[in-house]
Amino acid sequence: MKPSERRKARHCATQAIYQWQMTKANVGDIEEQFKIDQDTKGVDLNYFRDLLFGVALHCNELDKVFAPFLSRPLEEVDMVDKAILRLATYELTRRDDVPPRVAINEAIELAKSFAADDSHKFVNGVLDKVIKSLNKR
């Protein structure tokens, strides 16, 4: 598996998590529809699935990890930023095979791709505090 396959999986998972947050549809249905509608060539589909289902399953727990470091209530955080924070926090807390710096750098790149202009700074600041709270470097 190449790093680019995981990067593409994160990219797709961010979109799918966003869709799940907005629609509250069944995660399995979102996964299947995503595979039909999107070009998944070069995507680590197992990793995509793990991220999507992992975030959905552990959503409340993930929110509790990063919410204390937000500058505003969780309900006021942009849905794209929330999807990225949930995905990265999942990697930081549930994926020992992903170095913390990789999880943060990938989240920053996702924010640059999908979110508002300065979202990458917001995401970086929150996740830096998450790492410190988890005693990871």
UniProtKB/Swiss-Prot annotation:
Q: Which SUPFAM superfamilies match?
A: NusB-like (SSF48013)
Stretches assigned to coiled coil: none
Q: Which family does it belong to?
A: Belongs to the NusB family.
Record keywords: RNA-binding, Transcription, Transcription antitermination, Transcription regulation
Task: Note the superkingdom of the native organism.
Answer: Bacteria
Protein function: Involved in transcription antitermination. Required for transcription of ribosomal RNA (rRNA) genes. Binds specifically to the boxA antiterminator sequence of the ribosomal RNA (rrn) operons.
Q: Which gene encodes it?
A: nusB
Q: Name one GO cellular component term.
A: cytosol
* Source species of the chain: Aeromonas hydrophila subsp. hydrophila (strain ATCC 7966 / DSM 30187 / BCRC 13018 / CCUG 14551 / JCM 1027 / KCTC 2358 / NCIMB 9240 / NCTC 8049)
GO biological process assignments: DNA-templated transcription termination; transcription antitermination
> Which Pfam families does this UniProt record tie to the protein?
NusB
Keyword Transcription listed: yes
MF terms from GO for this chain are: RNA binding
Give the protein's recorded name.
Answer: Transcription antitermination protein NusB
